[in-house]
A protein has these predicted regions:
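The feature marks the mature, well-folded catalytic cores of soluble enzymes
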Residues: 1-89
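Small/polar loops that bind or transfer phosphate-bearing groups
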Residues: 24, 99, 158
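Predominant activation on well-ordered alpha-helical scaffold segments within soluble catalytic domains
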Residues: 34-37, 101, 164-168
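Structural signal for hydrophobic packing residues in well-ordered secondary-structure cores
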Residues: 37-48, 104-107, 111, 154
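Generic hydrophobic, helix-prone segments enriched in Leu/Val/Ile
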Residues: 43, 94-96
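Ferredoxin-type iron-sulfur electron-transfer modules in oxidoreductases and energy-metabolism complexes
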Residues: 67-94, 109-171
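Phosphate-binding glycine-rich loops and their immediate beta-loop-alpha structural context
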Residues: 97, 101-104
Length: 171
């Protein structure tokens, strides 16, 4: 398990409790440690311009006999929340999103209204595509229109997610 934070506060939540429970969405799972380190480098460069986030924590599971600290018990809960329904659809590329925020930083709508205006956990162009997939277009019908379709989000996306195309599809 790899955790990246902006303050290093997650490390304490991983080593102090006797039980460590990780809750992550399905798209956060990658096949190899090499894949994870590649994503970490891309994430830091796209989010903050750093080579690597200062606060990156690797957790290998429960404490072993030779370990000085760490949890006695370790559990991983993978959330779907509608994500597998995106597989095989025009929105499947959205599952590659690493939540770096590059699309938000370059979106003129996001710059004008901020993140809270989206009304959900995910904001900006990526949120305007992902949220309707997770909660349905009836409830999130306004989000795909929160874009000028200028394409800046796709230009800066390190995962090359075609956000404008997906926003047009929702519209």
């Amino acid at each position: 398990i790899v955790t990246v934070t902006n303050e290093g506060n997650a490390e304490l939540t991983q080593i102090l409790p006797d039980t460590h429970i990780v809750i992550a969405s399905l798209e956060k799972v990658v096949p190899t440690l090499e894949d994870a380190t590649t994503i970490l480098r891309v994430l830091a460069r796209s989010a903050t311009g750093q080579d690597m986030s200062v606060y990156t924590t690797f957790c290998t599971g429960p404490k072993r006999a030779q370990d000085l600290d760490g949890p006695e018990d370790f559990h991983v809960v993978l959330l779907d929340n509608g994500r597998t329904k995106m597989l095989g659809t025009e929105f499947h590329d959205m599952l590659r999103c690493i939540r770096c925020g590059a699309c938000l930083n370059h979106c003129p709508i996001y710059k004008a209204v901020g993140g809270h205006a989206y009304g959900w956990v995910y904001s900006g162009p990526m949120g305007a595509v992902l949220i309707p997939n997770l909660i349905g277009l009836d409830e999130a019908h306004h989000l795909p229109n929160a874009s000028t379709l200028c394409g800046k989000c796709e230009e800066v996306c390190p995962m090359r997610i075609p956000l404008p195309r997906m926003l047009r599809s929702w519209r």
